[in-house]
Amino acid sequence: MLERNFQAKLKKELKEMFPGCIVTKNDANDIQGLPDLTIFYKDKWATLECKKSANEKKRPNQEYYVDKMNEMSFSRFIYPENKEKILNELQQTVKS
């Protein structure tokens, strides 16, 4: 599965999981390494860096921004192999 296809399906799933949320696609050309998606739900926010598989190479600065944003709120690398785990973690974080 291509990353963009995984990302499109994930966006739909997030909108179903968190009714009324806003999911934005971040511009990789603006800040290199910034996670792909930002999710705003009620008074919470999270970012997700989408990968087409667990083996896909990380690009420069991605690890840095995922770690930094995770310290601020919630941020993870997400791919088909860990999607359910990450979405469960996100749900627990957002609903707390």
Question: PLM features: residue spans?
Answer:
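Catalytic phosphate/metal-binding cores of nucleic-acid and nucleotide-processing enzymes, i.e., regions
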Residues: M1-S96
